[in-house]
Amino acid sequence: MAAQRPLTIALVAGETSGDILGAGLIRALKARVPNARFVGVAGPRMQAEGCEAWYEMEELAVMGIVEVLGRLRRLLHIRADLTRRFTELKPDVFVGIDAPDFNITLEGNLKKQGIKTIHYVSPSVWAWRQKRVFKIGRSTHMVLAFLPFEKAFYDKFNVPCRFIGHTMADAMPLDPDKNAARDVLGIPHDAHCLALLPGSRGAEVEMLSADFLKTAQLLRQRYPDLEVVVPLVNAKRREQFEKIKAEVAPDLAVHLLDGMAREAMIASDAALLASGTAALECMLAKCPMVVGYRMKPFTFWLAKRLVKTEYVSLPNLLAGRELVKELLQEECEPQKLAEALLPLLANGKTSHAMHDTFRELHQQIRCNADEQAADAVLELAQ
């Protein structure tokens, strides 16, 4: 009698964040089904957990229209080859991790062949290009969503979706140790501390750094002991920021950090940041914040017409109200930013109330996401 085939899960991750999620999912599945087989497109973390890589993740990790166009033939070839090979393999479940432009079409191809498909990490369909929800519904048996309002959106369109919580909320403590973070960064325990996070993209750093620095100068007049920490994602962004600082605020003493955004947020009394995942991380670090964002006028005009949400930052979307101040476009200027940050640096009622709400929201999305994702995969595999 032929031996029963082990549980076979196919996965495709397209970037580092997806590799981290994939590795966590594989780990959780292996704990329950030790002989399971994992194949697909994997990064180093997924491979370290035992995923057989038919293609390296770097093949898919392209950003920007020009880069994508340059690699389009190769990407289309990989997708066609994966469709053929997965169809032959007939895995119990296919999991497309993020990379929606690549994965959702692949999921649709496989679903037509009778293979069960999951899309892990919802694209921001609730915010813009909402009609994508119909393609997602046709292509997948289940969407795994990090945030409760994402599930509410899919429910409206009868697309099966499971809220699993956010892996970042699992990884961060409910009560971070501010003094320990200050010790790591060399910040005195009794000083006022402000974190500036002008974004991870070159265009953001270019648009925001000067105003963020001028804001810090205004706040230093009010709080002479103010320590300013500026975590930057890589050497390129650091060089760009240093150049702007030399022109705008050469005499402002700041702590420039390579990475270490999380430590900077935990150590600080308040943060001024561009929107994006940084705002969620800042909320989980229990650091009161102001979101300041500016883009080119035409891009903003277009975004206002495309984006369907009342708020841009994740803490506000989670709270369903303006929990943190959002100052956009012409509102994003030093005087207004400083006025919004002053009550937070005072460390009084405003920041304590914000801290308490951040903690409640953290608990809402701290659901052991790796285990929840594994549950969803195994239920679909039955």
Curated annotation (Swiss-Prot):
What is the enzyme's main class? transferase
Coiled-coil ranges (or none): none
- Entry keyword set: Glycosyltransferase, Lipid A biosynthesis, Lipid biosynthesis, Lipid metabolism, Transferase
> What is catalyzed by this enzyme?
2-N,3-O-bis[(3R)-3-hydroxytetradecanoyl]-alpha-D-glucosaminyl 1-phosphate + UDP-2-N,3-O-bis[(3R)-3-hydroxytetradecanoyl]-alpha-D-glucosamine = lipid A disaccharide (E. coli) + UDP + H(+); a lipid X + a UDP-2-N,3-O-bis[(3R)-3-hydroxyacyl]-alpha-D-glucosamine = a lipid A disaccharide + UDP + H(+)
Fetch the InterPro entries from UniProt: Glyco_trans_19
Q: Name one GO cellular component term.
A: membrane
| Listed GO MF terms | lipid-A-disaccharide synthase activity; phospholipid binding
Give the EC number(s) listed in the UniProt record: 2.4.1.182
Q: Which GO terms describe its biological process?
A: lipid A biosynthetic process
* Similarity remark: Belongs to the LpxB family.
Give the PANTHER family listed for this entry. Answer: LIPID-A-DISACCHARIDE SYNTHASE, LIPID-A-DISACCHARIDE SYNTHASE, MITOCHONDRIAL-RELATED
What's this chain's function?
A: Condensation of UDP-2,3-diacylglucosamine and 2,3-diacylglucosamine-1-phosphate to form lipid A disaccharide, a precursor of lipid A, a phosphorylated glycolipid that anchors the lipopolysaccharide to the outer membrane of the cell.
Q: What is this protein called?
A: Lipid-A-disaccharide synthase
- Its source organism is Salmonella newport (strain SL254)
Gene (UniProt): lpxB
